[in-house]
Amino acid sequence: MFLFTRKYKPLLGLDITTSSVKLIELSLAGGQYRVEAYAAEPMPVNSINEKQIVDTEAVGEAIRRAVKRAGARSKEVAVAISGDAAITKVIQMPRNLRAADLEAQVELQADQYIPFPMDEVSYDFEVLGPSEKDNDSLDVLLVATRTENVEQRQAAVTAAGLTAKIVDVEAFALENACKLMTHQMPDGGIDRTIAVVDFGASSTTFSVLRALKVIYTRDFAFGGQQLTEEIMRTYGLSMEEAGRAKKEGGLPGNFQAEVLDPFIDDMTQQVSRSLQFYLASGSGR
């Protein structure tokens, strides 16, 4: 279940990917966030396939190792599903509805926008504010996913001895993170269009935010794994050896010119292509 608007005591932020699990624990004092604990642990091979958790115990064990390495104290966790596993839709609701009536009305209408049987779906909603389309209506963000996507993450977190309090969507988690960085943005990010590139092991997500809201996102199959594989081919290393060399160094002197620079060029072209797709989509208008 998504829990956009509810407040909890500090949680562990958990990023579960095909290559690793990353964890962070923050505290808030005097209006400033402070990192209390963080860690990253490699994900066992084949425990996640195409963003689906297929080995709950292996993922849970990786999470447990990350918690131990970080020395994190909280036992409650926020996780997220990928954007392509979620359905999002802004719908309009009468402005004069009470909170309980609004929830009932969303429940009645949700099946119009969700192409799955409702008993197989987890969904939640958030009121965005007055609608620009109709003065008598509210814009309401409806978000849904197959329940199995939520349960997979809950089960892995439970296997690690933790409790999943929030199951979010990565794009909305990105929005929330960007809101914490406004002091580093021109004009505090207000009325600004900002691109964010989330560079992963096997895929990269290119997102565009306007006024700190995601208005465009594109995933493409390119990531650090390509660099690892090129190191393997060039120097005759195993996957494990190449991954270690990539992180710790010690590669021959021609690594920069022969391997790294061409990889960076490819990465730059991929990001540039995503920017062109965004401009052509009309989302920027």
Where are the language model's segments positioned?
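Non-catalytic, solvent-exposed interaction/assembly segments
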Residues: 1-109, 151, 161-163
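Glycine-rich phosphate-binding loop plus the immediately following alpha-helix
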Residues: 48, 148-176, 213-253
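Phosphate-interacting basic helix/loop segments used at nucleotide- and nucleic-acid interfaces
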Residues: 7-8, 58-71, 180-192, 270-279
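Adenine-nucleotide phosphate-binding core of ATP-dependent small-molecule kinases
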Residues: 233, 242-285
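Active-site neighborhood for divalent-cation/phosphate handling
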Residues: 76, 80-182
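A short acidic Gly-Thr/Ser loop motif
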Residues: 14-21, 82-84, 191, 196-203, ...
